[in-house]
UniProtKB/Swiss-Prot annotation:
Protein name per Swiss-Prot or TrEMBL: S-adenosylmethionine:tRNA ribosyltransferase-isomerase
Entry-linked HAMAP family: QueA
UniProt keyword Disulfide bond, yes or no: no
EC number: 2.4.99.17
Catalytic activity: 7-aminomethyl-7-carbaguanosine(34) in tRNA + S-adenosyl-L-methionine = epoxyqueuosine(34) in tRNA + adenine + L-methionine + 2 H(+)
Keyword hit for Transferase: yes
InterPro entries xref list: QueA, QueA_dom1, QueA_dom2, QueA_sf
């Protein structure tokens, strides 16, 4: 199980650095996991891919403006990327600067705010805000949207809206659940009118989602941990959907991982779930919950393309990606989408 098997060459011009003018203006590549059949569609054609009674499960996390800039006491510049909010004052964060800040040192943020460096946990720093305000209030005031490295441009005002789903609810993600970016209020209303049911889980996407896999063998990879919640109401809806013979369609790999984490935590019988998950899905995994998924095009050698290969078949996904590149689909967070049905076990 070599990581290199998931490598592919992507022309730089296919990396989407800006979203389409309208959320639903993206293209949609349909992949049937069983037959490997592909179809080139528009995103609005997703209405033809779903059936009345199907259940679409969305991740309602809200991206926080997690990137802050400031200086150390020495005057050296630094950049802080919040990975997780521990409470109203404390965060775990990545800190980029010439020399790591020491324990008990003060970090001065833009806007005049200060944070104290409490401890270091491997690559992450625990920082505490010295203010009457909450960390979320300060982030909303001085933070920047944490665009992924491959977008390769500073964040702009428009990103505050477009790097966020229209149904976001629970603040805590430092990366968008990007499959959801294609949905606007009109298409959600059209799905409802067709009789498609919707449900919401939460997974606060961490910066680890962009970390490259640094081992040669997939089995040696240690997955990053993220907080997820699957409410009992969603569990009940899934049970009703399956009993009718309808499909559970996960919008995004984060929704897939949330649902499969809930099943894994209760030994395959789906129950409500709230807590950290480091589930790593790669070929050989037996899916317990999800029948189809909406997803964007992922980075080479990423855990997300491994998840997709587990879902729809290694050869089928490889062929789909070659087709997408040849047809000049737009890749990654602001790019186009796929609608994928599961390959039978």
């Amino acid at each position: 199980m070599r990581v290199a098997d998931y490598s592919f060459e992507l022309p730089d011009e296919l990396i989407a650095r800006y979203p389409t003018a309208e959320r639903t203006a993206s293209r949609l590549l349909s992949l049937d996991g069983n037959s490997g059949q592909l179809a080139d569609l528009q995103f609005t054609d997703i209405l033809e891919q779903v059936n009345p009674g199907d259940l679409m499960v969305f991740n309602n996390t809200r991206v926080i403006p997690a990137r802050m800039f400031g200086t150390k006491q020495s005057g050296g510049k630094l950049e802080i990327l919040v990975e997780r909010m521990l409470d109203d004052k404390r965060v775990l964060a990545h800190v980029r600067c010439s020399k790591s800040p020491k324990v008990d040192s003060i970090v001065c943020l833009d806007g005049g705010y200060e944070m104290v460096m409490l401890a270091r946990h491997d690559a992450l720093f625990e920082l505490s805000l010295q203010s009457d305000k909450t960390i979320l209030e300060v982030l909303e005031e001085v933070g920047h949207m944490p665009l992924p490295p491959y977008i390769d441009r500073p964040d702009e005002d428009a990103d505050k809206e477009r790097y966020q789903t229209v149904y976001n609810q629970n603040p805590g993600a430092v990366a968008a659940p990007t499959a959801g970016l294609h949905f606007d209020d009109a298409i959600l209303a059209a799905l409802k009118a067709k009789g498609v049911n919707t449900a919401f889980v939460t997974l606060h996407v961490g910066a680890g989602t962009f970390q490259p896999v640094r081992v040669d063998n997939i089995l040696d990879h240690k997955m990053h941990s993220e907080w997820a919640e699957v409410p009992q109401t969603v569990v009940d809806l899934i049970g009703e959907t399956k009993a009718r013979g309808n499909r559970v369609i996960a919008v995004g790999t984060t929704s897939v991982r949330s649902l499969e984490s809930a099943a894994k935590a209760s030994q395959g019988v789906l129950q409500s779930f709230s807590g950290d998950t480091d589930i790593f899905i790669y070929p050989g995994y037996q899916f317990q919950v999800v029948d189809a998924m909406v997803t964007n095009f992922h980075l080479p050698e990423s855990t997300l393309i491994m998840l997709l290969s587990a879902f729809a078949g290694f050869d089928e996904v490889k062929n789909a990606y070659q087709h997408a590149i040849a047809q000049k689909y737009r890749f990654f967070s602001y790019g186009d989408a796929m609608f994928v049905t599961k390959k039978a076990n």
